[in-house]
């Protein structure tokens, strides 16, 4: 196991002026590396401890997570009548057969074969799950004609310890989400040629990754306030955040130990492979995925993929929650589950719906023959 520990005294290679003025060394003798001692408070040193050993990590309350998941199930089911079809689903990940739970939301009045556009909607994390907080936006998607699948990929909460500890950030979780496409294609009323993907934060990270694969089944993607660069991210996040990555079996190390692994798992380094339209919205006052990280993706997309990328930077949008601008477009009253709109939230969602409608055409019922278009007199 490897670790980093900030000691009470940190030794750094430096040569003070006084040391440089010492007596000249004998010819042929290598210069000594002089040391300078920098004192550090012991309490601060304790805070800077980082370990990638699983036994050093704080335990999760799995019973509480499972209970919260049951409450989410109940709320989503209770609000479904007259609004949307709701179903708890499972499917096997195509990478290793792991059972992936999720939700299906669909219009009550189904069209015929291939009648509906569809989307895979990816929740955030690091450890997280699909909750009722996104319900008003999902309802609007269904009203617009979309069929929605929301996978709880490996590492999600509410499904027990083994599933939680199977987290593989930027690894097998991508395949878990990708396999949701196969589930959608198994539904006769879903058009396999009109499937999109979107997500926020960690969900935006997964969305961007899958959009930037050389071969992707998605026709369009929206990544909002996405994690983009794990190498850089771990340089400005604290030890607790670093532990959550470095302890994962698929990573098992910090960026300085496994730089290639972190690069492989960072969407920023795969922009060149993007070949579908993508929408990216970020906020300058984001206190989770800080703008200093997201601006790298925005600039690179604008430089390399201007014909495929639609990007917008929201300058200090109305805050929501502890992460300030991170949830600027997910402002929902936790009690009523109604939108708490701000100008930025309204603008972001309007742009998102127009983006997807331009590409996926959710209002088109392709189970019916396309109407004939007159080409001239008598036609």
Predicted regions span which residues?
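Non-catalytic accessory segments flanking enzyme active sites
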Residues: 25-108
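Conserved alpha/beta-hydrolase "acid-adjacent" motif
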Residues: 287-296
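Acidic beta-to-alpha connecting loop that harbors the catalytic carboxylate
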Residues: 125, 284-286, 317-318
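Primarily recognizes the serine-hydrolase "nucleophile elbow" in alpha/beta-hydrolase
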Residues: 180-236, 373
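Short beta-strand/loop motif that positions the catalytic acidic residue
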Residues: 274, 280-282, 286
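C-terminal catalytic histidine-bearing segment of alpha/beta-hydrolase fold enzymes
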Residues: 295, 306-379
């Amino acid at each position: 196991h490897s670790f980093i520990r900030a000691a009470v005294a940190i030794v750094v290679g430096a040569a003070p002026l006084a040391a440089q003025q010492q007596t000249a060394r004998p010819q042929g003798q290598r210069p000594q590396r002089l040391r300078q001692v920098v004192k550090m408070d012991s309490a601060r040193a304790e805070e800077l401890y980082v370990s990638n050993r699983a036994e050093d990590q704080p335990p999760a309350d799995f019973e509480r997570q499972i209970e919260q998941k049951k409450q989410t199930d109940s709320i989503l089911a209770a609000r479904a009548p007259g609004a949307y079809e709701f179903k708890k689903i499972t499917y096997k990940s195509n990478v290793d057969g792991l059972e992936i739970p999720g939700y299906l939301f669909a219009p009550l009045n189904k069209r015929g074969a291939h009648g509906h556009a569809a989307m895979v909607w990816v929740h955030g994390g690091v450890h997280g799950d699909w909750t009722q907080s996104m319900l008003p936006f999902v309802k609007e998607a269904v009203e617009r004609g979309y069929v929605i699948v929301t996978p709880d990929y490996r590492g999600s909460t509410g499904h027990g310890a083994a599933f939680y500890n199977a987290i593989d950030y930027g690894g097998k979780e991508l395949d878990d989400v990708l396999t949701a496409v196969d589930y959608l294609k198994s539904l006769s009323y879903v058009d396999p040629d009109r499937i999109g993907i979107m997500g926020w934060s960690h969900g935006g990270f997964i969305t961007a990754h899958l959009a930037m694969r050389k071969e992707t089944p998605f026709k369009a993607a929206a990544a909002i306030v996405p994690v983009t660069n794990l190498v850089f991210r771990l340089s400005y996040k604290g030890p607790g955040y670093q532990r959550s990555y470095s302890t994962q079996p698929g990573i098992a190390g910090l960026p300085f130990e496994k730089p290639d692994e972190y690069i492989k798992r960072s969407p920023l380094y795969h922009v060149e492979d993007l070949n579908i339209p993508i929408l990216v919205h970020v906020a300058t006052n984001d206190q989770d995925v800080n703008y200093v990280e997201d601006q790298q993706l925005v600039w690179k997309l604008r430089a390399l993929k201007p014909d495929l990328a639609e990007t917008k930077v929201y300058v200090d949008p109305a805050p929501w929650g502890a992460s300030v601008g991170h949830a600027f477009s997910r402002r929902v009253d936790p009690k009523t589950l109604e939108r708490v709109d701000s100008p930025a939230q309204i603008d972001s969602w309007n742009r998102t719906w127009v983006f997807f409608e331009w590409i996926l055409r959710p209002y088109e019922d392709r189970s019916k023959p396309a109407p004939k278009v007159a080409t001239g007199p008598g036609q």
